[in-house]
Curated annotation (Swiss-Prot):
The keyword Cytoplasm applies. S-adenosyl-L-methionine binds at residues 104, 123-128. It holds the Pfam family SPOUT_MTase. HAMAP family: 23SrRNA_methyltr_H (MF_00658). This is Ribosomal RNA large subunit methyltransferase H. Its main location: cytoplasm. Specifically methylates the pseudouridine at position 1915 (m3Psi1915) in 23S rRNA. It catalyses: pseudouridine(1915) in 23S rRNA + S-adenosyl-L-methionine = N(3)-methylpseudouridine(1915) in 23S rRNA + S-adenosyl-L-homocysteine + H(+). One of its GO terms (cellular component) is cytoplasm. One of its GO terms (molecular function) is rRNA (pseudouridine-N3-)-methyltransferase activity. PANTHER family: METHYLTRANSFERASE, RIBOSOMAL RNA LARGE SUBUNIT METHYLTRANSFERASE H. Belongs to the RNA methyltransferase RlmH family. It is found in: Cytoplasm.
Length: 156
């Protein structure tokens, strides 16, 4: 299984990339994690936000592998426990295929992507910086896999 993290935004600070990579390198081969940055549409183009999100959404859809599970990260989504995430990932691993996690930009994601998602998941009810969500998601994926594998990283 591969976890594909599609994140709208680029030119993140180095500590964001370093934090994400720290957890990505810890992942076992059977649960690889990969970050794909989606360049945001120019906000000074005179287009409406809906048009910008639709253009970003079209670029994301063009990159998504066919038959992958789609999980949208959104503060209004369901809040799972770590054990709940581990349980879901365990089921997804049995089903096979890859799982794509989508992180929107400053204006969010195209509503069509949210509507097409298999899951809409919130890391927190708080609004989080989008770069930080990359790190938190990578850490939670690593923690869930550690829990599945019986690794002592997760001690709660």
């Amino acid at each position: 299984m591969k976890f594909l993290v599609y994140a709208v935004g680029h030119k993140m600070p180095e500590w964001i990339a370093a934090g994400f990579q720290e957890y990505a390198k810890r992942m076992p081969r059977e649960a690889n994690i990969e970050l794909l940055e989606i360049k945001p549409e120019r906000r000074d183009s005179g287009k409406k936000v809906e048009q910008l999100l639709a253009a970003e959404g079209a670029r994301i859809r063009a990159l998504l592998p066919s038959n992958c599970r789609l999980v949208v990260m959104d503060e209004r989504g369901s809040q799972w426990t770590t054990a709940g995430l581990a349980h879901a990932i365990g089921s997804w691993m049995k089903d096979g295929g890859d799982t794509a996690f989508l992180i929107g930009g400053a204006d969010g994601l195209d509503p069509a992507l949210r509507n097409a998602a298999d899951e809409v998941l919130a890391l927190s009810a708080l609004t989080l910086p989008h770069g930080l969500v990359r790190i938190l998601l990578a850490e939670q994926l690593y923690r869930a896999i550690s829990l599945i594998k019986g690794h002592p990283y997760h001690r709660a």
